UniProtKB/Swiss-Prot annotation:
Organism of provenance: Geobacillus kaustophilus (strain HTA426)
The name this protein goes by in its record: NADH-quinone oxidoreductase subunit H
Database matches in NCBIfam families: PRK06076.1-2 (NF004741)
EC number(s) recorded for this UniProt protein: 7.1.1.-
PROSITE patterns listed in its UniProt record: COMPLEX1_ND1_2
Classification lineage: Bacteria, Bacillati, Bacillota, Bacilli, Bacillales
Length: 333
């Protein structure tokens, strides 16, 4: 129904619906960012034997992130004298905008989606790569050696892990016969691809953590090595753009893993009475929890280990997975 309205003859009602749905998605994502950060701090606190935020907004610290955001907005916005001012100002926007653009092709249920394009997976991968341009630009424009090194690390990491990420997703595309995300979910009606493609799921999840610059692959902003990495010279709301982009991508990547490998909104066979939106939310939250669990568990790897793992381990395994998938599909389907 919603898709028919969006694709019908342009009019004021379509425009109002378009902006209304966009505002709704923005509100949902911002709510996730707000309480996703809180959940991450609480979960990590529990795993480390701490309480976590418990002062602002009651005993559970429900308003702690809101207070942190207000603090960021009230901080002074400084620009280094030696910085390339236009590029320094533009870089956070370049990093932030693609994070929202990728949400347009993510189907959250069989009825709630914004753009049902035939190459939704390709669109996601292509647009998400643009954020690295903003990261590198911010590191270079800051005229700071730590920021520049962080930006270069981000570029090298993205190039290295984008390849196994894409190649692991090719196994899913081979089984589904489409790069349309809705079709990929439909192909998992009987068997989720996490069972048909366990190796691809493992490769994709590891590469996704690297793409998100999260522990143990957070080398572009390694505090113990680079102070704060590519955004070391940023403060206030400009720094908030980089942080917001990181957590919006966490939202998007968790949703993409749910779509590609966990059956999207399809339920477990004997629990079909539960709505698809609830199933999607449960799977999505499980993926987010695993990503938080990684951060609280693994130590940061060295730069040489990061590169070797991508090129010597993940890339060969992704090639093996493609060959096995092609053979199985040719012989049994």
């Amino acid at each position: 129904m919603m898709e028919q309205w969006l694709e019908s003859t342009p009019g004021w009602s379509n425009i109002a619906l378009f902006f209304g749905l966009g505002a709704l998605l923005l509100a949902v994502v911002l709510a996730f960012v707000t309480y996703g950060i809180l959940a991450e701090r609480k979960v990590m606190g529990f795993m480390q034997g701490r309480i976590g935020p418990n002062q602002v907004g009651g005993r559970f610290g429900l308003l702690q992130t809101v207070a942190d955001v207000l603090k960021l907005l009230l901080k002074e916005d400084t620009i280094p004298k030696a910085a390339d001012r236009p590029l320094y100002v533009l870089a956070p926007i370049i990093a932030f905008v693609p994070s929202f653009m990728v949400l347009a092709v993510l189907p959250f249920t069989d009825a709630f989606r914004f753009a049902d394009i035939g190459v939704g997976l390709l669109y996601y991968i292509a647009v998400s790569g643009l954020t690295t341009v903003g990261v590198v630009a911010g590191g270079w424009a800051s005229n700071n050696k730590y920021a520049l090194l962080g930006g270069m690390r981000a570029a090298a990491q993205m190039i290295s892990y984008e390849i196994p990420l894409v190649m692991s997703a090719l196994g899913v595309v081979l089984l589904a016969g489409s790069m349309n995300l809705v079709d990929i979910v439909a192909a998992q009606k009987d068997v989720w691809f996490i069972f048909a493609q366990p190796l691809a799921f493992l490769i994709f999840l590891i590469a996704a953590v690297a793409e998100l610059n999260r522990t143990p692959f957070d080398l572009p902003e390694a505090e113990s090595e680079l102070v704060a990495g590519f955004h070391v010279e940023y403060s206030g709301f400009r720094w908030a753009f980089f942080m917001l982009a990181e957590y919006v991508y966490l939202f998007a990547m968790a949703a993409l893993v749910t779509i590609l490998f966990l059956g999207g909104w399809h339920p477990v066979a004997f629990l079909g009475w539960i709505p698809g939106a609830v199933w999607f939310a449960l799977k999505f939250c499980a993926v987010v929890f695993v990503l938080i669990w990684f951060r609280a568990t693994f130590p940061r790897v060295r730069a040489d280990q990061l590169m070797e793992f991508a090129w010597k381990v993940l890339l060969p395994l992704s090639l093996v997975n493609i060959v096995l998938t092609a053979v199985v599909k040719a012989w049994f389907f």
